[in-house]
Design a protein with these regions (language model features):
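Membrane-interface extramembranous regions
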Residues: 2-143
Length: 143
């Protein structure tokens, strides 16, 4: 498979998002991030099971994007479906994160970088949408 500029965007974007999501999910297993995430979920009104589900979701999305990108040549027929599912899941995950940021009860000091406006989740959501767009363009060209 020849590397086109679109393929490179998809690959590098997937590696970045995968690393970002896995890292942040993994960090939430340790203090002080564990407590900060617990406060975010509790104050936003989401149920308690959202805490382990959120961590597992972030780590699995990250691993999905990283594994698809790293083993692209070996799993070429699975690359697009894995990146599609992980990117779509990331958009849902970041939609929930945006809602958490917008809850008035959630203090800024427990959010990433202490930033109350949802710049980070919206930026990540945009990058995940870029992945979906690149996959769509690639599929259109092949047919």
């Amino acid at each position: 498979m020849k590397q086109t500029p679109d393929n490179k965007i998809l690959k590098y974007n997937s590696v970045f998002l995968g690393t970002f999501m896995f890292s942040f999910g993994f960090l939430k297993l340790f203090e002080p991030f564990r407590t900060m995430f617990d406060v975010q979920i509790t104050k936003s009104g989401l149920p308690r099971f959202s805490i382990p589900m959120g961590i597992a979701g972030e780590m699995s999305i990250g691993l999905g994007l990283l594994s698809a990108s790293c083993f692209r040549q070996k799993i070429s027929n699975l690359f697009s479906p894995i990146v599609f599912v992980a990117s779509a899941g990331l958009i849902v995950n970041m939609g929930i994160a945006t809602c958490v940021h917008l809850q008035p009860e959630v203090p800024a000091n427990v959010l990433p970088l202490g930033i109350k406006p949802p710049f980070i989740p919206l930026s990540v959501m945009f990058l995940a949408a870029v992945n979906l767009f690149q996959l769509h363009r690639g599929n259109k060209r092949q047919s």
